[in-house]
């Protein structure tokens, strides 16, 4: 039987809806489903429900505890005091947890950042998606200590992925290998696609590539560990990561991007006269995400939206919203006769639309709120 995964609440949370679950700080819970941003858990009273994933943290299993302990004994690493900003959640009497004081240090190994993380305490390190950090210490409570851009601090380990198996991995060597791969691509001229930018993009770190709307680039790599970003080369030879939803693959690919491109074609789309919500001015039926992006960028104003059939799930829908900088897309699932967006449920699509005209459909980490203002015209 599969080993059950235990998580511990980092903060109190009061359920806002029936499907959610009240939790208390330091409460132990059993993880049932972590496939979405809200995790389904079970408490000691055998009640189940959804909680925000950033309100809980995984605890190591007994098997992993044994492995860490054996490794620690082999390396001769002693117990040290854990970082004070992380709450002590493991009970000393429960041997299914690793002692929170155990850690591995002097690792000096590179890791790839999978998600953005904003430091909440002075001793934490903010992470930027797509960058590399040097892991210096690993604490058994799931927090690692590392350095980036001259800053040192703690961060949650599940926000990064290790580049290699060697604990003494050479970060400079890793960068050299990547640079060699880029040079190899330049020499061989291997181009996966030629793409054109739909709108401008300003990089937030050294690995990303700045570009303007209309720029043409060669796609030279599609990183497996970050499928939402492609490595591209501009006409001037500069290479970097670009968000793939900011570009469109040109239908008639030139052999190289040095040729003068023709602008990508985008058919004029309009509200659909067929489909589940035919006749509603916000329903565009079977249009692609790319077509929705193009229409919103060409004709829309901030807050304009449209609803389209989902490309990946035939019975579901997507809300596409014009937003400053980057448009947003929200999946709406049809479960029997109920329309679900995140944890919220609506009896009709019209009810969903009216709700998000009054309540924010998206709130950023900085507190920016986005609403459905009016349908695209």
UniProtKB/Swiss-Prot annotation:
Keyword Nucleus set for record: yes
GO cellular component: cell-cell junction; cytosol; endoplasmic reticulum; nucleus; plasma membrane; protein phosphatase type 1 complex; ribosome; vesicle membrane
UniProt entry tagged with the keyword Endoplasmic reticulum: yes
Residues where Phosphoserine is found: 85, 91, 96, 166
Domain comment quoted from the record: Only the first and third SH3 domains seem to be involved in RASA1-binding; the second SH3 domain and the SH2 domains do not seem to be involved.
Subunit structure: Interacts (via SH2 domain and SH3 domain 2) with EGFR. Interacts with PAK1 and SOS1. Interacts (via SH3 domains) with PKN2. Associates with BLNK, PLCG1, VAV1 and NCK1 in a B-cell antigen receptor-dependent fashion. Interacts with SOCS7. This interaction is required for nuclear import. Part of a complex containing PPP1R15B, PP1 and NCK1. Interacts with RALGPS1. Interacts with CAV2 (tyrosine phosphorylated form). Interacts with ADAM15. Interacts with FASLG. Directly interacts with RASA1. Interacts with isoform 4 of MINK1. Interacts with FLT1 (tyrosine phosphorylated).
Full protein name: SH2/SH3 adapter protein Nck1
Organism: Mus musculus (Mouse)
């Amino acid at each position: 039987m599969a080993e059950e995964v235990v998580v511990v609440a980092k903060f109190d949370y009061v359920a806002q809806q029936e499907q959610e679950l009240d939790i208390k700080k330091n409460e132990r819970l059993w993880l049932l489903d972590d496939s979405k941003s809200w995790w389904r858990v079970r408490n000691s009273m055998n009640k189940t429900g959804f909680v925000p994933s950033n309100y809980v943290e995984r605890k190591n299993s007994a098997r992993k505890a044994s492995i860490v302990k054996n490794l620690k004994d082999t390396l001769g690493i002693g117990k040290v005091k854990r970082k004070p900003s992380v709450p002590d959640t493991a009970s000393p009497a429960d041997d299914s947890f690793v002692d929170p004081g155990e850690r591995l240090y002097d690792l000096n190994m590179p890791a790839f950042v999978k998600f953005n993380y904003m430091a909440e305490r002075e001793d934490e390190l903010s992470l930027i998606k797509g960058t590399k950090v040097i892991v210096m210490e690993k604490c058994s409570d799931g927090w690692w200590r590392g350095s980036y851009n001259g800053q040192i601090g703690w961060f949650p380990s599940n926000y990064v992925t290790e580049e290699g198996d060697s604990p003494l991995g050479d970060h400079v060597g890793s960068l050299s290998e990547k640079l060699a791969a880029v040079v190899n691509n330049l020499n061989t001229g291997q181009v996966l696609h030629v793409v054109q930018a739909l709108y401008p993009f300003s990089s937030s770190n050294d690995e990303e590539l700045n570009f303007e709307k209309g720029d043409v680039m060669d796609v030279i790599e599609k990183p497996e560990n970050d499928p939402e970003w492609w490595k591209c080369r501009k006409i001037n030879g500069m290479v970097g990561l670009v968000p793939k939803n900011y570009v469109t693959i040109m239908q008639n690919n030139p052999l190289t991007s040095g040729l003068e491109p023709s602008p990508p074609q985008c058919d004029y789309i309009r509200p659909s006269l067929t489909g589940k919500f035919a006749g509603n001015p916000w329903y565009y039926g079977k249009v692609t995400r790319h077509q929705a992006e193009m229409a919103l960028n060409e004709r829309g104003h901030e807050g304009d939206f449209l609803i389209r059939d989902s490309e990946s799930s035939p019975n579901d829908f997507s809300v596409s919203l014009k937003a400053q900088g980057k448009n947003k897309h929200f999946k709406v699932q049809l479960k029997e006769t109920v329309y679900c967006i995140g944890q919220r449920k609506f009896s009709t699509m019209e009810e969903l639309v009216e709700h998000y005209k009054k309540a924010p459909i998206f709130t950023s980490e900085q507190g920016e709120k986005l609403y459905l203002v009016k349908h695209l015209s």
